């Protein structure tokens, strides 16, 4: 059994940026990230369109899980808005929420996103056209990294973190239990304890997280899904 100051469950954007902030602001802390999937460079879906044309139900899906989360192979769009994409502002206020989104954008630019464009719907011809037709186009600023740059940013963030944060890949967490002074995190490899536990398992882990919250008597609510 190992003891940590902080265990982060999930190496998607939430887990990565939590680890980054801890490494920057409190480097003396012992931090670990437990991720069910593979490191970024080992995330390979076996579907090739030739020999394998459909899902073979891998034990851990390389598209959904692994360093970078489900968006690792996306076109890297980061939305800066309170109008959709979650309700963080309900907990910390709209201004602070936007400030934090801009902070994430600064980190993405710093780690490889220089030269990528920021787009906005505000004041555009499309916005005016929507208003004329009684449609409400939600305002947002959008950083478009692109698939290749998004991958580079993730590579650079991992290179920054790997020497100060312990990453455990292919490490599926079965349960989280409250104990005196912290939490016990149970995996197939054993039991580890920590003072603080950050759970950031994304959409694919939402049902598991709901059960953990129920066991720990943490209230939850359903969030809308943006399409």
State each model region's role.
Residues 66-116:
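Dinucleotide-binding Rossmann-like beta1-alpha1 core, especially the glycine-rich loop
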């Amino acid at each position: 059994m190992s003891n940590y100051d902080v265990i982060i469950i999930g190496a998607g954007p939430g887990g990565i940026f939590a680890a980054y902030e801890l490494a920057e602001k409190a480097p003396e802390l012992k931090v670990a990230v437990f991720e069910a999937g593979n490191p970024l460079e080992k995330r390979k879906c076996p579907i090739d369109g030739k020999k394998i044309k459909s899902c073979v139900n891998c034990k851990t899906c390389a598209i959904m899980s692994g360093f970078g989360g489900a968006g690792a192979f996306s076109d890297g769009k980061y939305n800066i808005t309170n109008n959709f994409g979650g309700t963080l502002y309900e907990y910390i206020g709209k201004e602070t929420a936007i400030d934090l989104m801009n902070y994430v954008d600064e980190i993405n630019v710093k780690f490889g996103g220089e030269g990528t464009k920021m787009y906005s719907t505000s004041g555009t011809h499309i916005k005016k056209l929507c208003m004329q037709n009684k449609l409400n186009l939600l305002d947002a600023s959008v950083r478009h990294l692109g698939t290749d740059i998004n991958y580079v940013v993730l590579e650079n963030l991992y290179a920054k973190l790997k020497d100060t944060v312990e990453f455990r890949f292919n490490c599926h967490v079965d349960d989280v239990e409250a104990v005196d002074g912290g939490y016990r995190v149970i995996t197939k490899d054993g039991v580890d304890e920590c003072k603080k536990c950050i759970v950031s398992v994304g959409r694919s882990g939402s049902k598991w997280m709901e059960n953990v919250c129920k066991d720990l008597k943490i209230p939850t609510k359903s969030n809308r899904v943006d399409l």
